[in-house]
A protein has these predicted regions:
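A short acidic-to-branched-hydrophobic micro-motif
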Residues: 50-53, 173-175
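Acidic (E/D-rich), amphipathic helical modules within compact regulatory domains
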Residues: 21, 30-32, 37-42, 46, ...
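Vicinal oxygen chelate
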Residues: 4-13, 42, 55-134, 154-160, 165-167, 172-174, ...
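A short beta-turn/loop motif at secondary-structure boundaries
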Residues: 34-35, 56, 88-90, 178-180, ...
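Core segments of cupin and vicinal oxygen chelate
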Residues: 1-2, 9-49, 133-171
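N-terminal beta-strand motif that seeds the catalytic metal site of vicinal oxygen chelate
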Residues: 1-16, 60-62, 109-144, 149-155, ...
Length: 237
């Protein structure tokens, strides 16, 4: 329904500082096009694509690509999705903006805005990107929204944070209670996470405060990017 996941679009007041932070975590820059009017860069670990946008607007958007977007509007409306903003003019780079019941911003774009990597990139220093976790007071309402968008919901029983996982072929979302942590999270896992955390600390990348309750700080850590994006690194197994 939404198309293929493109990137987590992140608004940053200082794109250079954000790029430097993610490169220290092992992300690599990709080539971008000229469809956007503001400074824009993309970094990836081979699974996650972070689009850094030096502009005003929502802090984070989940961006998808759906060719023929103008013709797709009626299908979205019929399925109960109502865009709150649209750019569909003949001279526009077509875009629809939506928002899920938990307040997560979503963008549907006519075409890609960066070139995919020519070869697989090794995972970042953070470990395996397992998904994007959203805080949601009404888990069932948010679950229904993403199921209607084509995601498959799975109940989670062995995760220290997430209660529901929502999967597609290009992105996994999870839902957690805001009392655990009130912000969205990029979640990475690795069975050897303590060693990864030690290497990051030795390289001068230090964890932020506010690790969700129940997670051992010796084996798990929360990092905050300059623009405010939170990355949760969890020991797996």
């Amino acid at each position: 329904m939404f198309g293929r996941f493109l990137e987590l679009s992140v608004t940053t007041p200082d794109i250079a500082a954000s790029v430097q932070f993610y490169e220290r975590l092992g992300f690599a820059q990709l080539a971008t096009g000229d469809a956007l009017p503001h400074p824009y860069g993309v970094l990836s670990d081979g699974r996650l694509y972070l689009g850094l946008h030096q502009r005003t607007g929502p802090a984070r958007r989940l961006s998808f690509v759906h060719p023929g977007l103008a013709r797709h509007v009626h299908e979205l409306l019929d399925a109960g999705f109502e865009p709150h903003a649209a750019r569909l003019g003949d001279d526009d780079f077509h875009e629809l903006q939506l928002r899920d019941p938990a307040g997560q911003d979503i963008a549907l774009l006519e075409a890609r805005t960066f070139s995919p990597p020519r070869s697989d990139h090794d995972r970042s220093h953070c470990g395996w990107f397992s998904g994007y976790s959203l805080p949601a007071f009404d888990i069932e309402q948010v679950r229904d929204y993403w199921e209607r968008a084509g995601f498959v919901a799975l109940d989670v029983t062995d995760d220290p944070l997430a209660q529901v996982a929502l999967t597609s072929d290009t992105l996994t979302l999870s839902l957690h209670q805001p009392r655990a942590i009130a912000a969205p999270l990029l979640v990475f896992t690795d069975p050897d996470m303590p060693e990864r955390l030690a290497r990051l600390a030795a390289a001068g990348v230090h964890a932020a405060r506010g690790l969700p309750a129940g997670l051992d700080p010796r084996a798990n850590a929360l990092f905050e990017a300059p623009e405010g994006t939170l990355l949760l690194l969890i020991a797996e197994g």
